[in-house]
Structure formats: structure tokens, C-alpha cells
């Protein structure tokens, strides 16, 4: 019985790992760099926005552009607005930082609203105004990227 349970757990973990590997990560730098940085971020976090504004350019110049390090950005939403924004960012992810940089640089323009519906409308309007061609509802309702 224990053997069956262990095998079942192993299969489940393998399946989850395979599914996680299918998600395209937002990655910058030399893939073979010895230094790997994984940044867990929330798109509504003001400190994360400050990192992208002040720290990331220096990190990129000194470590990423020189091939010394690589960085992977992972979503760690702290609220429902960040969760939906991260779903949209992941849904449209082409592996670069364009949408993340825009969301962080303009955080105060879209992180508004007294309800999730209002926050979603603000996010959708912002992305459209910025020229991101996104099927917003499809991304928000995509269960595979949750």
C-alpha cells in the first residue's frame, strides 16, 4: 500500500513538473551563467516597481549584459489585481520584459479601483492605451496559467 502511494505521489510530482516546464518564463541574461537570480514579484507591489525602476537597470548593466548572471522573473501576486495582471502578462509572454516594465513603470495608472471589476477595467484600458494587443478576457479566464 505504501509503495502504491509513493508511486502515485511520484507520478503527480512528475506531471506537475512537466506542466510547470511548459510555462514560458520571463528570463534575461546568459542561460549558461553561473549566477542565477529568481525574482518573485507582485505587479501591485510598489517595492517591486521600485526595483524595476532603480535596481534592475544597474543589475542588467553590471551582471546580465556582461554574461555573469541571469535573472528569471516569476509571478507572486499578493492580491487579486496583481493576480489578474500576472495572468495577462503570462498569457502574452514572449519571454521579454516589455509588458512587465510597462506595468511597473505605470503602476499608479492601472492599480486603482474599489472592486476587482473596476481594477480589471483599468488594467484593460491601460494595456489597450499602451498598444498591447491582448485578448483580455481570454487571458483572465485561462485556467492553464493560474
What is the predicted role of each segment?
Residues 77-146:
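Cysteine-centric redox/oxidoreductase cores and disulfide-bonded domains
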Residues 1-79, 83, 125, 145-146:
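Extracytoplasmic thiol/disulfide redox context detector
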Amino acid at each position: 500500500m505504501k509503495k502504491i502511494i509513493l508511486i502515485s505521489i511520484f507520478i503527480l510530482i512528475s506531471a506537475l513538473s512537466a506542466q510547470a516546464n511548459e510555462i514560458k518564463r520571463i528570463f534575461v541574461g546568459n542561460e549558461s551563467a553561473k549566477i542565477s537570480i529568481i525574482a518573485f514579484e507582485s505587479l501591485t507591489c510598489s517595492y517591486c516597481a521600485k526595483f524595476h525602476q532603480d535596481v534592475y537597470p544597474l543589475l542588467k548593466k553590471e551582471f546580465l549584459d556582461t554574461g555573469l548572471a541571469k535573472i528569471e522573473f516569476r509571478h507572486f501576486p499578493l492580491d487579486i489585481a496583481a493576480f489578474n495582471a500576472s495572468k495577462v502578462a503570462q498569457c502574452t509572454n514572449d519571454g521579454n520584459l516589455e509588458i512587465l516594465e510597462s506595468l511597473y513603470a505605470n503602476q499608479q495608472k492601472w492599480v486603482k479601483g474599489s472592486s476587482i471589476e473596476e481594477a480589471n477595467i483599468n488594467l484593460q484600458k491601460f494595456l489597450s492605451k499602451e498598444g498591447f494587443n491582448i485578448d483580455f478576457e481570454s487571458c483572465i479566464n485561462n485556467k492553464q496559467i493560474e
